[in-house]
């Protein structure tokens, strides 16, 4: 990530617009997984993960997600993009997907803190 001073206002506003959509989606997804994971119902967990990916595809189709790559780690951004064309088929896939979501959540918080400073 560049230093917050190196962004112009338009970049920051565009990032905030896209990140707020993704952040809302991410918050909903992580809450949903908190509900289904404790039940250890693997088919339900996989179904929810694929539903989440489908919803993500809708959200990103409506926005310029590329702006996120200017703010978050490039490797994490690429993982995020890769998941959009993927289908979760087993628990290992889900664990990798969930790990990416947690990293994305952490990254968004770090960016917000840096932009606020």
Task: Annotate each predicted stretch with a short phrase.
Residues 1-117:
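Surface-exposed peri-terminal alpha-helical interaction modules
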């Amino acid at each position: 990530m560049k230093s917050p001073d190196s962004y112009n206002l338009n970049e920051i506003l565009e990032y905030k617009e896209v990140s707020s959509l993704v952040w809302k989606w991410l918050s909903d997804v992580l809450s949903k997984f908190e509900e289904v994971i404790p039940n250890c119902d693997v088919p339900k967990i996989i179904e929810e993960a694929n539903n989440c990916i489908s919803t993500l595809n809708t959200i990103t189709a409506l926005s310029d997600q590329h702006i996120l790559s200017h703010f978050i780690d490039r490797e994490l951004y690429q993982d995020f993009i890769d998941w959009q064309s993927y289908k979760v088929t087993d628990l290992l896939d889900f664990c990798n997907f969930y790990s990416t979501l947690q990293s994305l959540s952490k990254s968004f918080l770090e960016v917000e803190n840096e932009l606020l400073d």
